[in-house]
């Protein structure tokens, strides 16, 4: 065998080895992601006495699992002054490979406290929200305040007009939630039309636009 042929064979072997390593690395990454998704379990918190521990505004540093992708949670109460006014509460954290959050707080206020809180929320500089994740104009409840991000989701407050305020949030990335969110929140607490499932139309639209 000539030296030239030996060199050529060596190059072919090297290229093949690199290709195999790339395939193995890709398969390894897919395997890690699959294992992460399969083994990660949602953290479900219903302990209202620890309410502030699960809110981003309780931390000075963004280096915390409760940073919530920088979303503004100031729509929610800074603290719970009257635990007896809490009708329902849940905060869910799930991180198979990217952190996502789902929460709701239902408060039954006195007429005086309701009026004050509703006024605070109506003064909040609400953002546009219609069209993100197929959300339509809210009709189920009156929308008092909303902070919406076209990528990271929603933080908002709703009212039934009878001294009850429902604070809720769905915070995530990559245009979908891996969490089966309908298992953890009453559907009427979601904004009308909300769809963050893995094959939601909004995700398809945004991914197509990013590929152009």
Question: Model regions: which residues?
Answer:
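N-terminal Sec-pathway targeting helices
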Residues: 1-26
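Residue-identity detector for threonine
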Residues: 2-3, 26, 39, 52, ...
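Intrinsically disordered, low-complexity regulatory segments
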Residues: 9-12, 26-36, 191-194
